A protein has these predicted regions:
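N-terminal binding-site loop/beta-alpha segment at the start of enzyme catalytic domains
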Residues: 2-86, 150
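Conserved beta-strand positions
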Residues: 27-29, 62, 90, 122-125, ...
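A short, structured active-site edge motif that brings together acidic residues
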Residues: 84-96, 123-126
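Flexible cofactor-recognition loop at the NAD(P)H-binding site
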Residues: 32, 65, 94, 117, ...
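Glycine/proline-rich, positively charged
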Residues: 36, 40, 50, 98-179
Length: 179
């Protein structure tokens, strides 16, 4: 099977082979609250989103753990553009503020409600690798994320990682379940 992600650059796009989705370049939403007082300029973010979409972009990356991100994305994107004109990826966090499996479901429901949408296009386990991997295993996040897709709350599932190749290899040791 060909790699799921193709190179990114001028005139190229990421391609998800199984879904035929093409993404010219993603729009990261982690730092919307960059002001000293942690407020967000919704008009400025709306303008940024409009420029990005006019240039052909449609993929927005957020996470439950990003302060103000989902709330801002709802106001600047969801309430202003048709749902079929964009893709939203969000992430579950098993290693922070998670004390039981039910916390993962609560995160998901909060994400959907805050964004004001019924489903995510992509749902990822956030920042897999290193010591965080144990939390994903402890709360059975692999099965949880799989169930999110099975319930129609996400079209695609996966993980994100900010770790060394060795840590990522360890996260996929033989006893890890593939989803």
């Amino acid at each position: 099977m060909e790699p799921i992600i193709a190179s990114i650059g001028k005139g190229t796009a990421m391609a998800f082979d199984v879904s035929k989705i093409n993404i010219p370049l993603g729009f990261g939403c982690m730092r919307f609250d960059g002001r000293a007082d942690d407020t967000v300029d919704i008009a400025q973010v709306s303008e940024m989103i409009d420029c990005y979409m006019e240039a052909g972009g449609n993929y927005f990356d957020t996470a439950w753990a990003y302060p103000n991100s989902e709330k801002t994305l709802r106001k600047a994107l969801v309430e202003r553009h048709p749902r079929d004109s964009y893709l939203i990826a969000s992430k579950c966090v098993a290693w922070s503020n998670c004390t039981c499996k039910e916390d993962l479901e609560a995160q998901l429901q909060e994400t959907l409600a805050t964004l004001g949408i019924d489903y995510l296009d992509v749902y990822l386990m956030h920042n897999l690798g290193g010591t965080r991997t144990a939390s994903f295993e402890k709360y059975d996040a692999w099965e949880f994320v799989k169930s999110v897709k099975e319930r129609g709350l996400a079209k695609h599932i996966g993980f994100s990682a900010h770790c060394t190749p060795e840590e990522l290899d360890a996260a996929f040791r033989p006893n890890t379940k593939a989803v």
